[in-house]
Amino acid sequence: MEYLNDEWDEFINNTNTNKPLERVFPDESFKPEFSNLYISTQTKIGYLNKCIPLEEIFWKLPIIDYNLPKEGILKKVIKINSKTPEDVIALDKNITKQKNCTFDVLLQIDSLTGKTTKFKDIRKITAGVSKKDLINFRKKKKSAFYNCFAVIIRIKYKNKFHEINIKLFNTGKLEIPGIQNIETLNIAIDILLKIIKKKCGYEYKYLKNKVETVLINSNFTCNFYIIRNKLHNILKYTYNIHSCFDPCSYPGIQCKFFYNKNNTIQNGICNCKTKCTLNKKNKKKNSCKVISFMIFRTGSILIVGNWDENILDII
């Protein structure tokens, strides 16, 4: 601490020091200890046994008060397209019946062109609040998806309350982002289906054998600092890994790992006759799974992609 104070005094007094900068590099005895891999969030897709009447169920789902320490639905969001003024009047009546309900008009057209009248009213309906609404303030409001509605369910897991986001599509498909384990997913869906059965009169079965993992975010740390430009050159020119490093736009090394289950050696390089592309429009034609990982100066490594947990050790 005294050494730092002396340096600060020299800087304040504009005193020039001839002390050379010391560059410290690890020697041969340095043995790094990598941390365990931590799966932070997963996005899963599930299915119910039949289709869902979205609007009917949405209006009947009850919202619990945020201050009450119990399980239930905290928030629900839907996007509704009204094609006539009568539909808007009926929509306003449903909104007034809901507790803590607001709406945002995303698009409104009411014009007369010749002999035809064009009318369109698109609204995002939001009822209830979640933890994110109380902590964060978003100036630009997010839109919502068609043919589905989203609910945030509070569950109790290991004596702690957690909030789980579930999107329900009219086909019976479920999308659950941001979960850490399958147990919280099953608890949340079980609570939701019980509420639908009790309040709406519809009985659905959750098909547990059809659950798919579409995205996993994981990370670990090397426990030492990384010289990014040198590592970038090694990855790109020695190992031929698709790598990009521009510290002005992103602080880490952005890499792509091409995984193909048919390859005997997984080196992260695409060996297909028709090279796999990173273009979003042509991604469906790829034979390889493209997994992204980012390497930061502090030694932290973030892995993102649509893959199975068994592929982690290979990467």
Q: Where do the language-model regions lie?
A:
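Intrinsically disordered, low-complexity polar/charged tails and linkers
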Residues: 1-315
